[in-house]
From Swiss-Prot:
EC nos: 2.3.2.27
Protein task: E3 ubiquitin-protein ligase that mediates ubiquitination and subsequent proteasomal degradation of target proteins. E3 ubiquitin ligases accept ubiquitin from an E2 ubiquitin-conjugating enzyme in the form of a thioester and then directly transfers the ubiquitin to targeted substrates. It probably triggers the ubiquitin-mediated degradation of different substrates.
Annotated segments matching region SBD: 95-280
Amino-acid positions noted as binding Zn(2+) 2 in the UniProt annotation, renumbered to this chain: C133, C138, H150, H155
PROSITE patterns: ZF_RING_2, ZF_SIAH
Family: Belongs to the SINA (Seven in absentia) family.
CDD domains: RING-HC_SIAHs
A single GO BP: protein ubiquitination
Enzyme class: transferase
Pathway(s) the chain acts in: Protein modification; protein ubiquitination
Binding site for Zn(2+) 1: C103, C110, H122, C126
Native species: Arabidopsis thaliana (Mouse-ear cress)
Protein name: Putative E3 ubiquitin-protein ligase SINA-like 6
Taxonomic placement: Eukaryota, Viridiplantae, Streptophyta, Embryophyta, Tracheophyta
Length: 281
């Protein structure tokens, strides 16, 4: 059972505070009113059971249908066969505009409340979106800040970046067969992951940051420098580091450096990784 708050929006559920003068000259302030909804299921479409979103339609008998179901039903109410999809249910729409629900990541620390139906928009940028530990066999999930602390205390492998003039430099050394190298940027409390994908044409190298796409995290670009024993140098500059909640085992389709097999120096791969924080506009 989930409790949600009905609050005023567009003048619907919650009354305005107003000052009213009484007969004796004193002002009386009306208290705001709110209500608690204990069952979110009543805000679901009775046909597809998905969350109702504006516009909401009703037939002549008052049966509800969401905008997605109406064309699928050929505008025929499944409950009474009356036409549906032409009459808006303004009462339900006003309720939807007034319902505030807690973030689904409240147990991780998020205190935000979101208007019903807009949860997914908030979750994409929520600072508390759960991130998965990239260490194989570890099932830990938590906010990106908690994940950093978890990794630092529990695993503590890989090197730590050193920074100069806002740029973090990491000497990344890994076996290609390991496929993944986890690096820490202490100043930002962030984990960056270097991944290798060995293919017939060479080794793909990509870098990602384990964090949500939240403004608080910031944006980063990265550069890779690879030098062979013979002195041949390859460089790659990515305009933006991809932020992920969980590391993928799929070869990247973009933002990668491809090192041909002819330039590899055995099973060990050594690179210089530079991470630069982009200035927010």
């Amino acid at each position: 059972m989930v409790g949600v708050l009905l609050s005023e929006r567009n003048g619907s559920q919650k009354r305005h505070c107003s000052s009213i003068s009484s007969d004796d000259g004193r002002k009386r302030v009306d208290k705001t009113r709110s209500a608690m909804l204990t069952d979110l299921d009543i805000l679901d479409c009775p046909i597809c059971y998905q969350a109702l979103k504006i516009p909401v339609f009703q037939c002549g008998n008052g049966h509800l249908a969401c905008s997605s179901c109406c064309p699928k039903l050929r505008n025929k109410c499944p409950a009474c066969a009356l036409p549906v999809g032409h009459i808006r249910c303004r009462a339900m729409e006003r309720v939807l505009e007034s319902v505030l629900v807690p973030c689904r990541y409240a147990d991780l620390g998020c205190t935000k409340t979101i208007y019903y139906g807009r949860e997914s928009t908030h979750e994409k940028i929520c600072n508390f979106s759960p991130c998965s530990c990239p260490v194989q066999g570890c099932n830990y999930t938590g906010s990106y800040k908690d994940l950093y602390e978890h990794y630092d205390l529990t695993h503590s492998t890989g090197s730590t970046a050193y920074s100069f003039n806002g740029v973090s430099y990491i000497a990344a050394m890994m076996f290609i067969s390991d496929k993944i190298l986890i690096e820490r940027v202490y100043e930002k409390k962030l984990l960056f992951v270097v991944q290798c994908f060995e293919e017939p044409c060479g080794v793909y190298v990509s870098v990602s940051c384990i964090a949500p796409s939240a403004p608080e995290v910031g944006e980063f670009s990265y550069g890779l420098l690879y030098t062979t024993w013979e002195g041949v140098t390859m460089t790659y500059q990515s305009p933006k580091v991809k932020k992920v909640l969980k590391v993928s085992s799929q070869r990247p389709k973009d933002s990668f450096m491809l090192i041909p097999h002819s330039l590899l120096c055995g099973p060990l791969l050594g690179m210089m990784l530079c991470i630069n924080e982009l200035k927010q506009m």
